[in-house]
Amino acid sequence: MIKDKHLIDPMDFTVEELKEIFKLAHEIILDPEKFSHVCDGKILGTLFYEPSTRTRFSFEAAMMRLGGKILGFSEPNSSSASKGESLSDTIKMVSIYTDIIAMRHPKEGSAKVASLYSSVPIINAGDGGHQHPTQTLTDLLTIEMLKDGLSNHTIGICGDLKYGRTVHSLIKAMSRYKGNKFLLISPKELRIPDYIREEILRKNNIEFLEVETLEEVIDKVDILYMTRIQKERFFNEEEYLRLRDSYILNKEKMNLAKDDMIVMHPLPRVNEIACEVDYDKRAAYFKQAEYGMYARMALMAKLLGVL
């Protein structure tokens, strides 16, 4: 049973539980009106201690489309956190007023801390450079919908593999499905952390290759996952500016790729995908954002036990 569980890490749910969520997401996609009142009377608390547009809107739209309501804040200055209130006290109070909480926080591990003090399910909407499990649900649902399942894919991940929480979560999640291989494309300074390389990939005998140019591997890729170089994760602006334009996907590079490859991106993008790529049938990132709302609808319905 998924009811009343917290979602802190993409590995918190078993493969079978994920299958259950995706099955419901499929049903919602086919007939959203059928589910428009399942959360009548339910309230989602949205605690965003860090700026967000897409993730916050996606959660709010998801709850509203299920018939529920939203309480929360989109920046800490508009909450009691600006007065010095502790995270634990905020969570205790908000869980009195709401039925489920989605929280984004800049500090790694904050969602886990929140789960210790909450009387309602906590959904981690991003904790620093650590985890972003609902983006992972979005990514998995997109792959399942557009690539006929979650196994036997060659997945190219390009850009910021060091600080990108979506990247770490995606590798962990896709490593659970058989036959997946990873092509990890980044400058040396932004390679995946050692714990991902050693504890997830090597420990589980998963095939992977680290390269520095997109052109040398793009023809082998089934799923290309692009990421932006995240300015907010850098302490040194000079280093950020040097690496910002490392990888730009354009029409010329797309001409080297498979006809049935899909291009994904967690968004927002800066300049790492040229706008000309938007018109390519393989560009899946806006469809991915749409699937994110359906994934969150299914997730919240399951956690609340209404379906």
From Swiss-Prot:
Its EC number is 2.1.3.2. One of its GO terms (biological process) is amino acid metabolic process. Carbamoyl phosphate binds at residues 54-55, 104, 132, 135, 267-268. Keywords: Pyrimidine biosynthesis, Transferase. It comes from the Bacteria. Pathway: Pyrimidine metabolism; UMP biosynthesis via de novo pathway; (S)-dihydroorotate from bicarbonate: step 2/3. Heterododecamer (2C3:3R2) of six catalytic PyrB chains organized as two trimers (C3), and six regulatory PyrI chains organized as three dimers (R2). Catalyzes the condensation of carbamoyl phosphate and aspartate to form carbamoyl aspartate and inorganic phosphate, the committed step in the de novo pyrimidine nucleotide biosynthesis pathway. PANTHER family: ASPARTATE CARBAMOYLTRANSFERASE, ORNITHINE CARBAMOYLTRANSFERASE, MITOCHONDRIAL. This is Aspartate carbamoyltransferase catalytic subunit. It comes from Clostridium botulinum (strain Alaska E43 / Type E3).
